Amino acid sequence: MGMKKTLLIVEDNLILCDILKRWLQKANYGVLTAIDEPSARRKIKENDVALVLTDVRLPEGDGISLLEWSISQGLHIPFVVMTEYATIADAVHAVKLGAKDYLPKPVHEVQLMDLLRGLLGLPFFVPSKKSFMKRRSLAIRETDRIACRVA
């Protein structure tokens, strides 16, 4: 089996960062974290990062300029940009600049793992029965909500 791939999460929301970190560690990725662009640049320089998962808006710098810096350094690290609905235009801009994809917030575990599998060539994420049932019940609740509005 190959070496564990190391991913960098660049996210200033510490709760979301911790959730993402736990999901990735559970999927057997190595995980580094940074809360702003300067610390993300340092981590990229000092480590063999296989992929960067970054928020667009950061307290110091932003995910777009981090991507631009990475490209200017001749690095070929795939970037995935996370964004809230209000910043979808930023995500589209990032993809045009070279980001591999973007994820809308809130980020969902299965969606993230399937995206990473596609980008890094790893096996599909197989959700547990519990997470499947949770997703199913959320989908059913959403369907019920829409049906009530229509009725």
How would you describe each model-predicted region?
Residues 14-32, 38-39:
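Two-component/phosphorelay signaling modules centered on CheY-like receiver
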Residues 11:
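Conserved acidic carboxylate
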Residues 129-151:
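AAA+ ATPase active-site-proximal loops
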Residues 87-89, 107-116:
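C-terminal output helix
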Residues 36, 62-65:
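Acidic catalytic/metal-coordinating carboxylates
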Residues 55, 83:
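Active-site residues of response regulator receiver
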Residues 42, 64-75:
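Short amphipathic alpha-helix used as the core "switch/output" element in two-component signaling
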